[in-house]
């Protein structure tokens, strides 16, 4: 994947403003609420019975932070995303059996969360760069499935 200097700047510039705990928790909660079938991968998280329960669930918050923290690894390694996510791809494929489509859904939700949090900064050019990034990350995570 080739990144232009402008794309790299748009991604890293916005990432520097992201509150990983809050945005991660919101993104994962939205995934579980908007796409309820994804909840089956989180049965051990306890009460996911309503949007309020999901949003207030400490395990959802913690895992959302973990997910977005690892997304930060992509931002730090834009030129080597495939290798950055090779172990996570293996885990999600071989052990957790997560449908790779869920990575794309989470990426789309992350775009929505970023747009909501950073209305001024999230220009169309910024969105295009982030859309490319979430697509590349989703593809890297789905790699072990092929």
From Swiss-Prot:
Heme b binds at residues 63, 92. Coiled coil: none annotated. Residues 2-146 form the Globin domain. Keywords: Heme, Iron, Metal-binding, Oxygen transport, Transport. Red blood cells. It comes from the Eukaryota. One of its GO terms (cellular component) is blood microparticle. One of its GO terms (biological process) is hydrogen peroxide catabolic process. One of its GO terms (molecular function) is metal ion binding. Transmembrane segments: none annotated. Heterotetramer of two alpha chains and two beta chains. Belongs to the globin family. Involved in oxygen transport from the lung to the various peripheral tissues. This is Hemoglobin subunit beta. The gene is HBB.
